[in-house]
Amino acid sequence: MIGYLFGNRVLVDDKELPLIEAYYLLDKGELEVYEDDKKLSKEEFLKKCLTYDERFLIRYKAYKELRDKGYTLGTALKFGADFRVYDIGVIPKKGKRSEREHSKWVLYPVSKDETFDFYEFASKNRVAHSTRKKLLLGIVSDKIEFIEVSWKKP
């Protein structure tokens, strides 16, 4: 596939890919990205991605880990999260959906060195709960660990 960098998106045929999905496909050798008439190397494209998102690599590592395992991820900006994650085998669609077709988690990738206070943690958990999803923290270091958090009423 061939894509063309256009701001913070990559245009492929009649689709717009977010930078993170374009980088994933480039990383797998399934996409070539051009800016104007110049083919970008993986390193050049990564630099472009980092100009839009300084946390790109942290987000990408968690994204890649789940995509490689067969999960589908989408943006979760409207939920105040980085990504929404669909169970393996679920294809997101618009319109009326069964319970199984909704995303199961909202994902917040964080570096193992990052800290956040209880209020920030509670805020992330409330967002997940209010959207009927579970909170998934992706702890990124040399390896990626995922922690699933559920909201319980006493």
UniProtKB/Swiss-Prot annotation:
Catalyses which reaction(s): pretRNA = a 3'-half-tRNA molecule with a 5'-OH end + a 5'-half-tRNA molecule with a 2',3'-cyclic phosphate end + an intron with a 2',3'-cyclic phosphate and a 5'-hydroxyl terminus
Transmembrane segments: none
Domain of life per record: Archaea
Keyword flag tRNA processing: yes
Any single Gene Ontology cellular-component annotation: cytoplasm
Top EC class of this enzyme: lyase
Subunit comment: Homotetramer; although the tetramer contains four active sites, only two participate in the cleavage. Therefore, it should be considered as a dimer of dimers.
GO biological process: tRNA splicing, via endonucleolytic cleavage and ligation
Gene Ontology MF annotations: lyase activity; nucleic acid binding; tRNA-intron endonuclease activity
A Pfam entry, by short name: tRNA_int_endo
UniProt keyword list: Lyase, tRNA processing
Protein's UniProt name: tRNA-splicing endonuclease
Organism encoding this protein: Nanoarchaeum equitans (strain Kin4-M)
